[in-house]
């Protein structure tokens, strides 16, 4: 008999795979991956053709801590979206594929997307 925590994590992995089997990032249009945990938010630009992370920002990065972006809330999520958009522009990236992972497009995930759009990324 399996326990409920194992089933919950198994369902989370399945949801993420269901989303990611359709999405593929390239060097011209990388994948914008958003992960949230109980304490932090992580945002990455990933080139799946070479399997490399092009840029990343999070609430645990030194630059975010210096800017006061340490709590996990919607305002911080929007600021992280703007930051990743600025980094993407410096890498000549203007179009991305949004990867929400196993999370609903709601709340913090939606605010990261809105911040990235405000920063100039298109998806």
From Swiss-Prot:
One GO BP annotation is: translation
Q: Which UniProt keywords apply?
A: Ribonucleoprotein, Ribosomal protein, RNA-binding, rRNA-binding
Kindly indicate whether the keyword Zinc belongs to this entry: no
The disulfide bridges present are none
Q: Which GO terms describe its cellular component?
A: cytosolic large ribosomal subunit
The UniProt record lists the keyword rRNA-binding: yes
What molecular function terms (GO) are annotated for this protein? Answer: 5S rRNA binding; structural constituent of ribosome
Q: Which family does it belong to?
A: Belongs to the universal ribosomal protein uL18 family.
Role description: This is one of the proteins that bind and probably mediate the attachment of the 5S RNA into the large ribosomal subunit, where it forms part of the central protuberance.
> Quaternary state and partners of this protein?
Part of the 50S ribosomal subunit; part of the 5S rRNA/L5/L18/L25 subcomplex. Contacts the 5S and 23S rRNAs.
Provide the protein name. Large ribosomal subunit protein uL18
Organism name: Chlamydia abortus (strain DSM 27085 / S26/3)
Specify the taxonomic lineage. Bacteria, Pseudomonadati, Chlamydiota, Chlamydiia, Chlamydiales
